[in-house]
Amino acid sequence: MTAATQFDQVSIVKRANVYFDGKCVSHTVLFADGTRKTLGVILPGALNFGTDAPELMEVQAGQCRIRLEGSDEWKTYAAGESFSVPGKSRFDIDVIETLDYVCSYL
């Protein structure tokens, strides 16, 4: 496997992060430099998330539409694309096809 498809020399938090009655499940990945990411799956449906820190969401598989707080515009994202969400904000996500994602906390 290449560096683009895996993370090496990391720690994984065993307990899953489960949100919205299991519609979103992720695991936290801890890096030696103190950074963290979550790897997760969101099932089809419409959800609203809040953020503490700014986030970069990288879509690994699936498709979704995103609307950032304060915007009327929906944008569509698919595998290989990413979007950023400001810290201390909210966003709507409409998952069209089961979403496999990596979330980086910036």
Swiss-Prot record:
GO terms for molecular function: guanosine phosphorylase activity; purine-nucleoside phosphorylase activity; thymidine phosphorylase activity; uridine phosphorylase activity. The keyword Acetylation does not apply. Keywords: Glycosyltransferase, Transferase. The keyword Flavoprotein does not apply. It catalyses: a purine D-ribonucleoside + phosphate = a purine nucleobase + alpha-D-ribose 1-phosphate; adenosine + phosphate = alpha-D-ribose 1-phosphate + adenine; cytidine + phosphate = cytosine + alpha-D-ribose 1-phosphate; guanosine + phosphate = alpha-D-ribose 1-phosphate + guanine. GO terms for cellular component: cytosol. Pfam families: Ppnp. InterPro entries: Ppnp, RmlC-like_jellyroll, RmlC_Cupin_sf. It comes from the Bacteria. Its EC number is 2.4.2.1, 2.4.2.2. Belongs to the nucleoside phosphorylase PpnP family. PANTHER family: PYRIMIDINE/PURINE NUCLEOSIDE PHOSPHORYLASE (PTHR36540), PYRIMIDINE_PURINE NUCLEOSIDE PHOSPHORYLASE (PTHR36540:SF1). Catalyzes the phosphorolysis of diverse nucleosides, yielding D-ribose 1-phosphate and the respective free bases. Can use uridine, adenosine, guanosine, cytidine, thymidine, inosine and xanthosine as substrates. Also catalyzes the reverse reactions. This is Pyrimidine/purine nucleoside phosphorylase. The lineage of its organism: Bacteria, Pseudomonadati, Pseudomonadota, Betaproteobacteria, Burkholderiales. The gene is ppnP.
